[in-house]
UniProtKB/Swiss-Prot annotation:
Keywords: Aminoacyl-tRNA synthetase, ATP-binding, Cytoplasm, Ligase, Magnesium, Metal-binding, Nucleotide-binding, Protein biosynthesis. This is Phenylalanine--tRNA ligase alpha subunit. It catalyses: tRNA(Phe) + L-phenylalanine + ATP = L-phenylalanyl-tRNA(Phe) + AMP + diphosphate + H(+). Tetramer of two alpha and two beta subunits. The lineage of its organism: Bacteria, Pseudomonadati, Pseudomonadota, Betaproteobacteria, Burkholderiales. It comes from Paracidovorax citrulli (strain AAC00-1).
Length: 350
């Protein structure tokens, strides 16, 4: 075996011993690098006589090609081994049972509605339900809303087919109609007591659900949720409203130092009326007054439309937006995110 054959054999053995691509590149440098043994042989050709240079150069090139071939074969072998190891690591056992699709979770607004119902349920409030397509009487007239009130216009309300000119049908603009329906049924149930001059059990109810208005922007949607509350009895005062709603807000936001403010306002169905603001004492919203609800003492005309004597029965009502409460609770700035159906966004609340 001559010198060049020994060189090729040494390169093959060293390449075969290389366990990683890095080891192989280090071995390559010893033979084909700038200071490698083959490179040195090629540089030495310049010192040979012309007659010998041609034959010697051809022999060195043959050895170089053999070394490069051995190098490429080892590279491919290492790549194949790496791929095989990766495939084995990622191999699927087809005898295993299939993976079940992950279960979904409740929508963040649904979580808020459940929380609201739970808190008021602990205070003795019932939960009312009712139709989303409502009559003009339950949605407006029974709630002391004047015929010329702007809320009755098509610019604010979605009217639907099926009604008459004197009794149109519409998508309810608030959940107050459910309160009226609940109160009317409650009064019918206890009519015998009322006729006998006996006290009727108090009406305590909340009415959560979807409502509809002609509106759409970052903080409003044509479909939104609302939850209204009603407490009617013989000795229910504005003080009770403050106690109940303060307890609710502090429980909902888990903040015992939450501050509430009642600002004078106007609603057709309550008198006096007040907007309710809250103020957090810490966190990113600390120090700001944030409107969360409207409220007031139920107007005598509304009490009368329930079938009760407003001289004897009195109470309070409030209305809040669960969507708004959800935004405040989770720090979301755009209401439309809740209804775009983006799983990436909604999955954060599961």
């Amino acid at each position: 075996m001559n010198e060049l054959d020994s060189l090729v054999d040494a390169a093959r053995r060293m390449f075969a011993d290389a366990a990683t691509p890095t080891d192989l590149e280090n071995a390559k440098a010893q033979f084909l690098g700038k200071a490698g043994r083959v490179t040195e042989l090629l540089k030495g050709l310049a010192q040979l006589p012309v007659e010998e240079k041609k034959s010697r150069g051809a022999a060195v090139n043959v050895a170089k090609q053999a070394i490069e071939q051995a190098l490429n074969e080892r590279r491919q072998a290492l790549a194949d081994a790496e791929l095989q190891a990766q495939l084995q690591a990622e191999a699927l056992d087809v005898t295993l049972p299939g993976r079940q699709r992950g279960q979904g979770g409740l929508h963040p607004v649904s979580l808020t509605l459940e929380r609201i119902e739970g808190i008021f349920g602990s205070m003795g409030f019932d939960v009312a339900d009712g139709p989303e397509i409502e009559s003009d009487w339950f949605n407006f007239t029974a709630l002391n809303t004047p015929e010329d009130h702007p809320a009755r216009s098509m610019h604010d309300t979605f009217y639907v087919e099926g009604g008459t000119a004197s009794a149109p049908l519409l998508l309810r603009t608030h959940t107050s109609p459910m309160q009226i329906r609940h109160a009317v049924q409650h009064v019918k149930k206890h009519r015998a007591l009322l006729d006998a001059g006996q006290p009727m059990p108090e009406i305590r109810v909340i009415a959560p659900g979807r409502t509809y208005r002609v509106d759409s922007d970052a903080t409003h949607s044509p479909m939104f949720h609302q939850c209204e509350g009603l407490w009617i009895g013989e000795n229910v005062s504005f003080k009770d409203l403050k106690v109940v709603f303060t307890a609710f807000c502090r429980t909902f936001f888990e903040s015992d130092d939450l501050v509430l403010r009642f600002r004078p306002s106007f609603f057709p169905f309550t008198e006096p009326s007040a907007e309710i603001d809250i103020q957090f004492q810490d966190g990113p919203l600390a120090g700001r007054w944030l409107e969360v609800a409207g409220s007031g003492q139920v107007h005598p005309n509304v009490v009368r439309n329930m079938g009760l004597d407003p001289e004897k029965y009195i109470g309070f009502a409030f209305g809040m937006g669960p969507d708004r409460l959800t935004m405040l609770r989770y720090g979301v700035n755009d209401l439309r995110l809740f209804f775009d159906g983006d799983i990436r966004f909604l999955s954060q609340f599961q």
